[in-house]
Amino acid sequence: KVIEYDRFQPEFYEDTKTYISKRTSTKKVQKGLNFYNDNKSLIKNVEKKFDIEKELLLSLMGIETNYGTYVGKMDILSSLSTLSFDERRSEFFTNELLILLKLIDNEKIDYKTLYGSWAGAFGFFQFMPSTIKHYAIDFNKDKDINLKDPEDAYASAANYLKKIGWKKN
């Protein structure tokens, strides 16, 4: 199944209008407003600390996981293992698998929670293991980086954008 999903990614065969229309709706906008209203303090704190627009972060979260309501059901260890043996992008996925195994071994992430996309992405913003390693943060200071928690996930996404050079308009 993983290889099948990899071969037929909608980003590569749908035109922009079709792709966007399938991923936007009045219902999704309402879900975004609900997330914003439920997390105003977090959103304002993150925007101030990282200087990243809330509109950008909320849009990304909406597209990636419908505001955390769909984070994927695939075992990402299995997905990355499978993809690492596929010759098309073996080096990339092998590297991601090795990073994930190190994160588990160093107890940075709990292997029992590793369900996400077919491609090995995880959490509310669908971070790949290398992104987790370099940019995920424990924003709520509970000694656990949990990318399925609004505080850690939202702040980690802002941290990622800031560190790769995103500049606020």
Q: What label would you give each PLM region?
A:
Residues K1-N169:
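Catalytic glycan-binding domains that act on GlcNAc-containing polysaccharides
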